[in-house]
Amino acid sequence: MGEFQHAIDAKGRLIIPAKLREGLGERFIATKGLDRCLFVFPLAEFEAVSQKLRGLGMSSSAARAFNRLFFSGATECELDPQGRILLPANLREYAGIQKDCVIVGVENRVEIWAAERWAEYSEEAGELYTEIAEKLGF
């Protein structure tokens, strides 16, 4: 849980906040997320998501398209001694990440957002927060 601001260095490395590192473990999977952010899953959680996606089958064109994007972007990451991960260029490009990032702890994963995109998203979603909560029965 939580929201943290960090910057990507010139080599494409990003510090993962200590609070979030504990839940991720030392090795984890980063991939293309929804809403143009990146999803970062602990290995066991990624396997659970993978199994669920495998269950969608190959006959649905929507399932095939989603699986292609989700798995083609997946990369195993490892923390360096400073608590950083190297985000590949293709994932940074997908999420529009150039320098400033927002790292968000969300339930079973971590999301990495370009700071500008997070600001836009959170403003839009914030306006609908109550409405969304009501629709979800919260």
Curated annotation (Swiss-Prot):
The keyword Acyltransferase does not apply. The keyword Cytoplasm applies. GO terms for biological process: negative regulation of DNA-templated transcription initiation. Keywords: Cytoplasm, DNA-binding, Repeat, Transcription, Transcription regulation. GO terms for cellular component: cytoplasm; nucleoid. InterPro entries: MraZ, MraZ_C, MraZ_dom, MraZ_N, MraZ_sf, SpoVT-AbrB_dom, SpoVT-AbrB_sf. GO terms for molecular function: DNA-binding transcription factor activity; transcription cis-regulatory region binding. Residues 3-45, 74-117 form the SpoVT-AbrB domain. It is found in: Cytoplasm, Nucleoid. It holds the Pfam family MraZ. Belongs to the MraZ family. Forms oligomers. This is Transcriptional regulator MraZ. It comes from Symbiobacterium thermophilum (strain DSM 24528 / JCM 14929 / IAM 14863 / T).
